[in-house]
Amino acid sequence: MPRSQRRRVLVALPTAWDGKQLAACRAAWEERFEIVFGEPDDESCRADLDPAAWVEGYAAAAERGDGLDGVFSSSDYPGATLAAALATRLGLPGPDPATVLRCSHKYYSRLAQREAAPEATPGFWPVDARRPGELPEGLPFPCFVKPVKGAYSLLARKVDSPAELAAFLARPEVKEYVGGYLRLFDRLVAAYTGFELDGGFFLAEELLSGEQVTVEAWSRAGEVAVLGVVDSALHPLTKSFLRFDYPSRLPAEVQERMAGIVRRVIAGLGLVDSMFNVEMIWDPQSGRVSVIEVNPRMCGQFADLYRKVDGTSGYEVALALAVGETPRIERGGGRHALAASFPLRVFEGVRVARAPGADDVAAAEALYPDALVWNECSSGQELTDFLAFEDGRSARYGVLDLGGPGREELIARSRRVLDRLGYRFEPAAPPRPRDFR
């Protein structure tokens, strides 16, 4: 198709996964779409970014230039909200920014979940992190606490007593996170919502247990369609994510119940014309299905798992939705029976003595069809400040996405790929102070 006839789509605040995943499925979209990667990218976005200026800058460029036919973002924060604001400003398909923030702000999201699916919503209580000595009455212990606007699993953990919770909220890392990293979130909340609770709150929740999954789906024209259910394999002690498996091994009846809950929750939140993923947990002892959280954007890390098994990448779905089309997928249309994403982790502080170069990554990917390798560290880097990484008890330094005939073979392939990459680590010094600017 001539360039002038292709649909022009902006990827707002592109993430590390966007370029890699879009390149992997290029043959499926390059004749129909022209991709524009926005600035800044997700990693370099600062907390002092002006949301209104960003939206108006891209809107003005679109109106005086080649225009835009769609916009989306796989960036959880702030990309999903900014993409929604720009789509609204230009009259393009997409959710409105207030709805994205309602999904993203864990307290207001829980309120909507409790209204739509009370049986799947655990008890929850807002806690002001700026007043660690003033805890809400009736808060049960042990409980699970997390920021109302999280980043991966950063600063999310189980606490066993009021004293432990107060001490945790008083930590410098919490103050830096709330007062620094979430400054932009507070501006987004002020600009697009009437929320009374800003980013300075944490949410204390009833403990959940069971088998954890991610239900990824999309909402289009009032209908919700499930793209896939991905199982989470957790470290038995740290509860770090060790592997994500697609398709899920949960009983079909449980997956159907989850899909029904997701449809009610998304309708209650009012999210339309968007991909999203809902983290859920099933307790096989009680049969209870619970919502962990709603993320109003695609999961870039999982996109090629669907391509490996079903033949359609999550990015193909995102592009279709961005221009107002209904995505179409064919179950089992890929070349692999199973696919898995392997986060690579260290559980003790280390210095990266050797990280793979581009040639190492290419050689590792060449070992197996459709293999994708993402390296997240560099030689000489220290992986010691675990509070800056997801669960606070490990550090992720890369990701492997692989397809194969079965789980044991996938695990064996991951070991061979990791060996070929040639990472080397050595003990490291204690962590230095962090900067949340």
Summary of predicted features, one role per range:
Residues 48, 54-65, 84, 88, ...:
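N-terminal beta-alpha lobe that positions the nucleotide/phosphoryl donor
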Residues 157, 205-206, 396-404:
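Short, well-ordered beta-strand elements within core beta-sheets of diverse protein domains
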Residues 172-173, 198-202, 206-248, 257-289, ...:
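Phosphate-binding core of ATP-grasp and ATP-grasp-like enzymes
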Residues 120-122, 162-208, 240-241, 264-268:
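Conserved ATP-binding module of the ATP-grasp superfamily
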Residues 257-277, 296-354:
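Active-site "cap" helix and flanking loop/linker of ATP-utilizing ligase/carboxylase catalytic domains
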Residues 346-381:
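Glycine-rich active-site loop/lid that clamps phosphate-bearing ligands
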Residues 1-99, 128-133, 324, 346-348, ...:
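ATP-binding N-terminal substructure of ATP-dependent carboxylate-amine bond-forming enzymes
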Residues 148-153, 336, 393-396:
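Short glycine-enriched loop/turn motifs at secondary-structure junctions
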